[in-house]
Regions:
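Ligand-binding clefts of soluble mixed alpha/beta catalytic domains
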Residues: 1-512
Length: 512
């Protein structure tokens, strides 16, 4: 007597589970230009590193003798795997089984995915494609929706806990609604595919029933909608591109809040000087320039990874490396609103700073901040509310900051760019004060300008006079900045700072 019969049964069930929703469902998935979940996992993870959990979970049908006739696998697949030889947990809805809408086993596995990542303190990656609950779900057979037991904990508890302890990255790779959509946004990094993904509170049929308006999934929640409202951080050209972006994001973060991000080998000399930096800021204060070019010239070559580019366009956020050390980049983009902080830009700022604070990633702020965005639209958007929240996020930040005054630094909004006890450098092009010259002079010298024989000439005269007071040299003389530097020296100064703060970062882990 042995257990061969039972092992054959195990093998049979595994084979049925691997078949997912069947050949026809897989064919339809491919015809829509989308991979199956198992294909996605294989592409995302290091080769042969996936160790599935709950492989044969699902609903079964047996004959009168108790022999297995069929198995409908759980429409959620999860397990351990490795990315660049580092352990992660990955999970996602299997759209080939019931369109990814959770069956009983799938629901349990989806919750367990977060608990597993939390237990082992490793990054969590979600690959979303599926709907939420269905009116044809559990209540259809039981005659009603009894709900969860009174002692059950909220499914959102583990969702919230993951965000406090481990990196969470989510990809939307098809239509995503209900609880999967909520999980998608409850992530540190969110990416959706350009043409195949939609994030929806409710689909077209529900919207038409409620509003009498016919709309496609793409019109309701495609990437063109959500890249502008901040629901997704980034948009990917393909599923493979989405996986590469997730890998890039995770490369800057530690495994959990109890570790620090890793330094990598760097062949880019810290004393590299780029002549272009000497002329990159126009002498004409009203002209814009490319802040991203500064980032690329100062930090390690090809190391900049941008997040949330199309939401809050006046603000730039992302990660880079300096001499191999990972740092966060927080900057202004003078091409949009002259770099001023809008309500959306402030929301983007707050979220990004808190992400860096959670995982102890030092922040480099490149400042060209004329102040909060003004005007009726800005007031309606609650700019002062969200802007103040951004300032408070900076004030409460516990990571090391280095602030480089590139050009403007004005108003309350400027306070969002200077972390506690930060290392402050200024370029010769820097200017700072309570208000920008253009508005400040017009207000402070209103009567004097109006009574002048040539008001325009008087205004220009006053602006030139006041500009000297906003120069960085008086600040350097009074030790209000650590150094005023040649822009070409920026890389070296920041690289030396990044090395100095490592002991500070290690000590901060003791307070966890």
């Amino acid at each position: 007597m042995n257990w061969k019969k039972e092992t054959v049964e195990i093998k049979k069930r595994r084979k049925l589970a691997k078949a997912q929703g069947g050949e026809e469902a897989i064919k339809i998935q491919h015809e829509k230009g989308r991979l199956t979940l198992r294909e996605r996992i294989n592409i995302l993870l290091d080769k042969d590193s996936f160790h599935e959990q709950g492989e044969i979970a699902g609903g079964v049908e047996v004959d009168s003798d108790g022999k297995l006739e069929s198995l409908t696998p759980a429409n959620f697949i999860l397990g351990f795997g490795k990315i660049n030889n580092k352990q992660v947990v990955v999970g996602g809805e299997d759209f080939t089984v019931k369109g990814g809408s959770p069956n009983a086993a799938g629901l349990r596995k989806s919750v367990y995915t977060e608990e597993l990542a939390l237990k082992f303190k490793v990054p969590l990656i979600r690959l979303h494609e599926g709907g939420g609950g269905s009116v044809a779900g559990p209540g259809k057979k039981s005659g009603g929706y009894g709900g969860d037991p009174v002692f059950s904990k909220s499914r959102f508890k583990s969702v919230a806990e993951t965000l406090r302890e481990i990196p969470v990255a989510s990809a939307a790779l098809g239509p995503v609604a209900g609880m999967p959509a909520a999980r998608f946004v409850a992530s540190h990094f969110r990416v959706m595919t350009k043409e195949t993904a939609q994030i929806l509170v409710a689909g077209p049929a529900v919207v038409e029933r409620a509003f009498g308006k016919k709309m496609t999934k793409e019109e309701l929640g495609g990437s063109e909608i959500h890249k502008l409202n901040g629901v997704t951080d980034n948009v990917a050209d393909s599923e493979e591109d989405a996986f590469l972006q997730i890998k890039s994001f995770l490369s800057y973060l530690p495994q959990n809040i109890y570790e620090l991000s890793e330094k990598i080998d760097c062949n880019d000399p810290i004393d590299r000087k780029e002549e272009e930096l000497l002329s990159i800021i126009p002498k004409d204060r009203k002209r814009s320039y490319e802040m991203r070019d500064i980032v690329k010239l100062v930090f390690d070559k090809d190391s900049f990874f941008e997040m949330t580019k199309f939401f809050g366009k006046g603000i730039i956020t992302g990660f880079a490396r300096i001499n191999g050390f990972p740092v966060a980049i927080f900057a202004n983009d003078s091409n949009f609103y002259a770099g001023s902080m809008s309500a959306e830009g402030a929301q983007k700022t707050s979220r990004f700073i808190r992400l860096c604070d959670t995982f102890r990633i030092p922040i480099v702020s490149l400042v060209d901040e004329p102040g909060f965005l003004i005007g009726p639209d800005a007031e309606r958007a609650g700019t002062i509310l969200h802007g103040t929240e951004a300032v408070l996020a900076t004030t409460e930040s516990k990571v090391p900051w280095s602030t480089i005054m590139i050009r403007k630094s004005f108003g309350v909004a400027a306070a969002a760019h200077y972390g506690p006890d930060g290392y402050v450098l200024a370029w010769p092009s820097a200017e700072s004060g309570p208000l920008p010259l253009e508005g400040g002079v017009a207000v402070a010298f209103k009567k004097e300008i109006a009574s002048a024989k040539n008001p325009e000439a008087k205004r220009k005269e006053l602006e030139e006079k006041m500009a000297k007071n906003q120069s960085p040299f008086p600040r350097a003389e009074s030790f209000s900045v650590h150094e005023i530097i040649d822009p070409r020296e920026t890389r070296k100064y920041i690289a030396l700072w990044a090395e100095r703060i490592q002991s500070q970062l290690k000590a901060s882990l003791m307070n966890r």
